């Protein structure tokens, strides 16, 4: 993914002025179709390019096309350029304005996504990444969100320093890696009329499954993913604690060595002997490499996302349960009367 932004036009590195994203209904339908097809084929994520243009303070997404599956025999950049040339021939907006990716229950944060968006945003100033939640949309909640990297995240990637001190100086955490850009879906007036007519044609009983309680599999999947991320974060914490213990032990050894050398030099000076040479302490005690903290930060963000979704899901399920119980009690009371 990181190399796919290389062929795009380079923009000046000033702060973008994009206030919101306007996505055509055609592009949304193509994104939805591609993501659902790939989710049925057991592919982890579906990805594609977004095409459009920038008009004043909005980014218009007018078309898109999917990226091919990973194949060593195919040049991805050449494929992308060829697709843009073909779209240009048929008078379709061919300017690259970002990319899209599918997500699993809102959890899209990953190292590969951060790296890809960094390369896109440094090559194309206005670029965004559009995240489509396949599973949540399949339950009736269209989830389409646009994100951009924050200035702190871009500075972090430019410096390439992921130590705790560097992240603390940048005041960056998983909460401010991305900034969400409002996204609106635009349809032509004729399309809106047709949607209104189709809505009236749907029977009332078809849209009344709001009290469906068969959601155990969804909650089970989220809890299983949450447990995996907690285990991963625990392993990262163990690694960092081990590093801190090594640093403390090394500092103690260094202090003992310096005290011993000072005592030896004092004894030699009392005997009018030449003192021992002062050796470089850092050569004797080489500092341990600091484990990078970027991956633990991302895992913590994934845990936070899963926790929020589980909390929201349980609240909705409890509300459904109480409503269903009230309706059942009313039905039984009516039958008894």
Curated annotation (Swiss-Prot):
Coiled-coil region(s): none
Gene3D superfamilies (UniProt xref): Cytidine Deaminase, domain 2
Start and end residues of each MPN domain: 21-153
Entry's localization field: Cytoplasm
Keywords for the protein's UniProt record, in alphabetical order: Cytoplasm, Initiation factor, Protein biosynthesis
Pfam families xrefs: eIF3h_C, JAB
Keyword Protein biosynthesis tagged: yes
Predominant cellular place of this UniProt entry's protein: cytoplasm
GO terms, biological process: formation of cytoplasmic translation initiation complex
Family matches, as SMART domains: JAB_MPN
This protein's name: Eukaryotic translation initiation factor 3 subunit H
Source organism (scientific name): Bombyx mori
Organism lineage string: Eukaryota, Metazoa, Ecdysozoa, Arthropoda, Hexapoda
